[in-house]
Amino acid sequence: GYYVVSNGKVFHNITDHADSWSEAPWRVHPDGYGKDWAEYNKWELWQNEESSRYIHPKTLRGPFCESADVSDTTYIDGRVAQKTIADLRRLKEMKVPFFLACGFWKPHLPFNAPKKYWDLYQREKIQLASNPYRPKALPKQVTSSGEIRGYGKFTTTKDEAFQREAKHGYYACVSYIDAQIGLVLDELERLGLAESTIVVILGDHGWHLGEHGFWGKHNLMNHATRAPLIVRVPHCKGGKAGGVVEFVDIYPTLCELCKVPVPEGQLQGKSFVPILQDSGKKTKQYAFIQWQGGYNIVSERYSSAIWLKGDSVVGRMVFDRQSDVAENENKVGSVSLSEEIKELETQIRIKKLQLEK
C-alpha cells in the first residue's frame, strides 16, 4: 500500500487521527495550538511593551497583519515547506508509493508574511473592491468580517487605509505560499519524481476582500465558497476546465488515477478524471455547501441558498452566475426564474435528507 505522511495544517482539527497516517502527523506546534497561549489566563507569557497595544486577554490576537524583514522559515509555512522537502528525499530513498500531505496556513488570518513578499506590491496601486455594498434583499443571515474584527489594530472595514493594508497583506501571503509551493515542486523535479507523482493544490475556502463590504469567509456567497483546485497529472495536458466539482470528488479521482479500488457505497464524491482528459466534459450537475443554518446549491448557471428554521424557509438568495458573476443582485423575487428556483430548492432538500440518514 501507500506510505502516508502529514505535515502542517492538513485538517482544521490539528490533532488528527493517528491511524490515518503511517507515522505521527508533523506539526510546528506538536501539541496543536499549544495551551500556553490558548488559555486566556496565561497571556502574560508573551506580553511586552509592543504586544500590549494589541493583546486582548480573552482572544489573544495581535494585529491582523505583519511585515517582518525575516527569512521564509521564520514563519510557520516556510518550515512546513522545508519539512515536506526533507520528506520527499526520505520517501524517494524508501522506494515506496507515497501520499504526502502538505498543509500551509496562509493566506489565512493573520496576514503575516516576510517583508520581501509585501514589497512585490505597491499599496497605493492595489484596486479596491468595485462593489463594496450589500446587495438589495440579501438575507440578514449573510454576514462576514467577524474574524478580522477580533484582531488588534482593526478600526472599521469602511476605512480605506484598512482596506488597502488588509488586501496588501492578503496578496503578500498568497505570494509567500506560492513561493513555498514552488520550492516543493522544484524538489520534486530535482529528485526525478515529478513524472510519477500527481500533485493536487487546493484551498479550503475563498475570501472576501471588501466585496459587498465583507472581509472574511463565513457566508454562502461565491467569494467565500469558491476555492482553488489545481491538479497536475503526469503526461496530462494542462488547461482550465469548467464544470462543477466538489472537494469530496478528489478522493475518487485520485483512486481512479492511481488504479486504487474505490470503497463501494461509501463515497459521496464522483471522479472528475473525465474533465482532466477533456475540459469540456461534465461529471455532475450541482455542488452543495452548508454553513450554519444555510444550505447552498451551485450549478453552472445559478447559485441558490436557503436558511431553514425547522422546515420553514427564513431566508433566500439566488444569483445568476452567468449575467451576475459578482453576485450583486439577489434574484429571489424574479418571476421568470420561479421554476428554476423551485427546482434548486427541491434539490437542496433532497440532499439535506440524504445527509441526515
Predicted regions and their residues:
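C-terminal cap/loop subdomain of S1 sulfatases and analogous C-terminal strand-loop tails that border
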Residues: 28-39, 43-46, 205-211, 217, ...
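A long, amphipathic alpha-helix that forms part
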Residues: 78-92, 155-197, 257, 339, ...
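Active-site regions of oxyanion-processing enzymes, predominantly non-cytosolic
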Residues: 14-39, 75-135, 189-198, 339, ...
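A short beta-strand-to-alpha-helix junction
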Residues: 73-74, 137-139, 167-175, 193, ...
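Short beta-strand segments
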Residues: 8, 99-106, 198-203, 230-231, ...
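Long, internal low-complexity/basic segments
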Residues: 148-165, 173, 312-314, 323-326, ...
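Histidine-centered active-site microenvironments of extracellular/periplasmic hydrolases
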Residues: 110-116, 186-236, 243-246
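Catalytic-site neighborhoods of secreted/periplasmic enzymes
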Residues: 1-73
